[in-house]
């Protein structure tokens, strides 16, 4: 019986140490702050949000010092995800102001973060609801066209400021929208020809 207790204690201790170790290894990338760098520039470089970068480094202000080492949180947004987002932004927000492009990219990220939608960029963009794709450019093939540089920049900005918007999960053009359901959503902001809603 004593042997069983010792084995149980050793096993529990080993598991707790292993669990702690895997938790601390979750964010192992670091960045040495250079003169003139900001949270936004660093977050943009690594494809993480400013909020997450500040949170993991216990920072509440925007103050950074050259030579300071920051821990970079892991991100689930790959380069392929960014490219896919940029192509969707380019197709959905063609002719819209830059702020509208950022807002479209933010809707994608908000959906990824919402329990009501798929939890990946690809899953959100290619989601089908009642037999229809959620985004028209997926349905009509415009998603396959290359993204313009402004749309790529808009995606980077949306990633850097992830979680700081108004929580929009939808957007639509009221002149072309045919769904009464979308028109019933609470509008958070209007940018260009698009209304963004929850």
Language-model features: where?
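Core subunits and conserved enzymes of cellular information-processing
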Residues: 2, 40-43, 113, 193
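Primarily a LysM-type cell-wall glycan-binding module
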Residues: 21-47
């Amino acid at each position: 019986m004593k042997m069983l207790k010792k084995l149980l204690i050793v096993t529990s201790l080993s598991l707790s140490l292993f669990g702690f170790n895997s938790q601390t290894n979750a964010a192992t990338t670091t960045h040495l702050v250079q003169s003139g760098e900001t949270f936004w520039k660093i977050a943009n470089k690594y494809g993480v949000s400013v909020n997450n970068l500040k949170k993991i480094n216990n920072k509440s202000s925007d103050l950074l010092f050259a030579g300071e080492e920051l821990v970079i949180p892991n991100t689930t947004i790959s380069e392929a995800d960014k490219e896919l987002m940029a192509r969707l932004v380019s197709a959905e927000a063609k002719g819209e102001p830059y702020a509208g492009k950022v807002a479209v990219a933010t809707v994608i990220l908000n959906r990824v973060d919402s329990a009501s939608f798929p939890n990946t960029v690809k899953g959100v963009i290619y989601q089908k609801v009642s037999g229809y794709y959620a985004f028209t450019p997926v349905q009509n093939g415009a998603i396959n066209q290359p993204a313009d540089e402004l749309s790529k920049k808009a995606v980077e900005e949306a990633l850097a400021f992830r979680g700081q918007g108004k929580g929009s999960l939808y957007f639509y053009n009221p002149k072309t929208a045919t769904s009464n359901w979308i028109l019933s959503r609470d509008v958070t902001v209007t940018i260009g020809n698009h209304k963004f809603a929850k």
